[in-house]
Amino acid sequence: MKTQQLLNYAFDQWIAGDTSSLSDLPSAIDGSLVARTGSGGLDFGGMLRHAREKGGPALRKMTFHERARLIKGLGLAIMARKEELYELSYQTGATRKDGWIDIEGGAGTLFSFSSKGRRELPDAHVLLDGQLEPLSKSGSFVGQHIHVPLQGAAVHINAFNFPVWGMLEKLAPTLLAGVPAIIKPAS
């Protein structure tokens, strides 16, 4: 297996970490170097600004159903490359069955959230909460509670034990809710 430097997806592009601060990721099978990773040199404040100013508005322009289809597309992309992921998973010491729970379980989580989003949420930008409520005695003034995406960004830190599924179970509801995410994988 060829050693690769893992890239960081930030600012809508793949960015290599500063090579002077990379960490080695050895194989649990034979100790050989599988990959190198690092986030040195990344502008984390800029990443949050980008999430708030670019990612958030782009997600909020989408309806719940559009975001659900985006999540399904991510699940399909993972399934299309699952054999590559199984090969990498093996290097962590996981059996194929272990990897199945992580990889295909992660994709299944995306499919589940996508399905729930299309079945249980409207093809709209807001979610109505309850009935109209009269706010005046005569009924000339009423109110309606709604749910809308939060402003800002979610920051998720992933664990070692399920590197795919663990990240995706956090990412799916975040995206469905219309909130951009910054994810720190275990390394």
Predicted features, each with a name:
Residues M1-K137:
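N-terminal Rossmann-like NAD(P)+-binding subdomain of aldehyde/semialdehyde dehydrogenases
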Residues D123-S187:
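Conserved small-residue-rich beta-alpha loop and adjacent elements
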